[in-house]
Amino acid sequence: MTIEFLRSELKRIIIALTASGFDRVNSGTVEKLDKIAAVAEMIGMKEGKRLIGNLSNTMKAIQERKSGAASGTVRLMALDFYVEKLAGDEDMEEL
């Protein structure tokens, strides 16, 4: 997997969560985040792994009613910022 592939997968998840909200999170989304976090770790994206893991853990807590949407929103925004920064870094390399 390339960074671009990870970025596009994360962006899809971010868009889906933004559209549907955290109340409709399914286990498949959480599992996908966990797999993406593992790949991020393998390719040395420590901050990406941390942010993805934070969102995944928060989503699990929301499913278990141990956390609320506000907590998920903060993690989602942090991950979205990171993903956009990855896109910006790639654009700079092309110049």
Regions found by a protein language model. Give the residues of each.
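Amphipathic, coiled-coil-like alpha-helical segments
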Residues: 1-16, 42, 46, 54, ...
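Alpha-solenoid HEAT/Armadillo repeat architecture
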Residues: 19-22, 38-41, 60
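Alpha-helical segments in soluble extracytoplasmic regions
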Residues: 22-32
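Short, well-ordered alpha-helical segments
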Residues: 28-29, 43-59
